[in-house]
């Protein structure tokens, strides 16, 4: 007869938590003495430990949380008030031990206890799916490379190397990778999702996801910072690439490709399954818990399976970044010098604590004592910050993941409407052009998205200053932008009307987007100038 498991204890009415290891150890001791009947084992454990009220409840008051954010204007104050309200709701959840908000924090929805963007929590032996969001493993990845082409030509190649927008790659255009053949698909949270994994490789989606081309100035100080922090491989690769070309002040400039995206449809499906399971399991052992605060205990089978599924999605997302970068390097005949990256929508295990970040960059020290290397984009016209974490435990050792917003996308667009309520497309185009002057900005759909331009975000300088003020990370280098590709404005959100579209209509939408993309590339080819460094 198999030994008693954590799931058996849950089924018998115990609430998952710190007591579980002792319960399982006691059960194992009885089993060594020859007692194997599950019902009798449960009775013995009830005698030894007592039965708890199986219904867990919210705390009467929220536990305190730290704020690495300060207001500089009225919009900031209103935004921070909303962040505090939602964090206070969330931190009544009994399994959460600590919380923090970053300089880019902003509310992420209206449902009770919804963790804000820029929010982080520490949880004992449990995972809250909403606290990593549906865009699981949204992350950054950078490749420093040597190339001889122009910005325009490289962006043309980048446009061909990736894909943006709704949907995924058609079967004839898919990209293979060994990550698709891992023996993982029997996991109940991943079973049947092979198609989502296959169709979204070399695909970045929409919203704030991007592929950015820039320049990284490699100085002696930067290399020494990396070496001192223990990132020897990266420091050595950069040192070898600049040997004979570097001086004490200016350094050497390299092109750098930076991509930002999550796990696409694969992660969205996993999130839906995980959140449903969390609500189901939480309702079985607790009462009065808002759906956004539902959790999966990692000592149960469901929690362990979900954790395993998250790790796979992390590997899949890293493979997706690497595929896009390798396709780009092949098309441009460029040579990679080094690469690095980080997640900012994920769950990380440190001992028995599961750190959740929804738009928060890990900034602690790894198991070897090295400050984590991070990439923090602020907007498409501002430098992407290369950081080393300061491991500031007051703020759960996180840093921001971007600039954040002070108002919703809808509110941003409201200022660019005509008297009749229609969008003033000319005013939108002017605002985007003014905010990105001198940069080669491409929109996959052919039409710009104002809310993803610098107009839609907090001032970059403000967020950067607060990173330093609160001691979250050290900025050791910058990737200065040359150009960027984003999905752009594809019209009404397709996933809200997809059920009403025929396959032919869906193909027509994609074909129109392709034609706009081709026209845009043609215009850039006609006007490009050689700007290689």
State what each model feature region is.
Residues 1-52:
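Charged substrate- and nucleic-acid-binding regions of tRNA-handling and nucleotidyl-transfer enzymes
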Residues 69, 84-86, 94-101, 107-117, ...:
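Domain-length cofactor-binding catalytic modules of enzymes
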Residues 45-75:
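Low-complexity, highly charged intrinsically disordered N-terminal segments
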Residues 21-24, 39-43, 169-173, 476-481:
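Short coil/turn segments at secondary-structure boundaries
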Residues 78-79:
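A beta-strand/beta-hairpin structural motif
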Residues 145-147:
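Acidic, low-complexity central loop/insert segments
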Residues 142:
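N-terminal glycine-rich flavin-associated loop
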